[in-house]
Structures are given as C-alpha cells and as structure tokens.
Amino acid sequence: MADHYTLRLAPGVRQRLSERARRAGLQERTLAQRYVEEGLRHDAHPLIQFIDGPSGRRASLLSRGLDVWEVIATIRDNNGSMAEAAEYLQIPTGLVEAAVAYYGEYRDEIDREIELNEAEYERGRAAAAAGEQALRS
C-alpha cells in the first residue's frame, strides 16, 4: 500500500499537472507519482531519461535514443564486454557504464524489457516465416 503524502504546489504547477494528466489520460496523482519516481531515479542516474514508446515508459540514455535494455542486451551479446558494446553502439564507454549502473539498481525492470523484446522478435520471425511459406505454396 502506498504512503499518503500531502504536498503544496507553486502557483500554476497544479494547473499544468492537471492539464498534462488529462492529455496523458492519467489521474493527477498517478502522473505526480511517476514524476517523483522518475525524478529520484534521474537524480541518482543523471545520464538516464524516461520516454514513452510503443512498449510503454522506459529508461533510455540521455540524448542518445538508446534504451537501457538495448545497451544491456548488447553487452550480453558481446560476452559481457562493455568496451565492445560501446564500440558496436558507437557511444562512449561512460554511457555504457551509466546504463550498467542503472541496470544494477533496476535489474528486474530491464530484464523484463529484454524478455518482451525477445518475445516480440520471435513473433515477428514466425510471422515472416509463415508469410514466406504462404508465398511458396
């Protein structure tokens, strides 16, 4: 169960929160909770930002367009080498290290995103194979 917390907002902040929540189809308290959680995560991991996408809200490297799960999956694909992953992704090793630091704290979340991506890839492969089979028959 969540803890109750009362907060006074500066003039205009509540109105902007209300408008943003309405546009996002969320309750104000849900959006405020998300902002607090993501703000705390960003304070601890300043090279990580949070963005919306087809699979929902996710952690990504600031100004890079790479999700944390993509960096972690690439490290795994390179036998755990952060240097090789950085070279493959064409990003500084420091950004790979930032993704690894975030992963260390939110491993279950990132592993779940990797699993979802792998499942989606397999569905796509199966659909492509079925399409190729249909073309041959």
Language-model regions: role of each:
Residues 1, 42-66:
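Short, Lys/Arg-enriched anionic-surface-contact patches
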Residues 1-9:
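Short Lys/Arg-rich basic patches
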Residues 7, 17, 24-37:
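Short amphipathic alpha-helical segments
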Residues 20, 84-87:
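Short alpha-helical "recognition helix" segments of helix-turn-helix
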Residues 40-44, 97-112:
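Short, solvent-exposed alpha-helical "recognition" segments
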Residues 54-62, 114-137:
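Intrinsically disordered, low-complexity basic tails/linkers immediately adjacent to helix-turn-helix/homeobox/MYB/SANT
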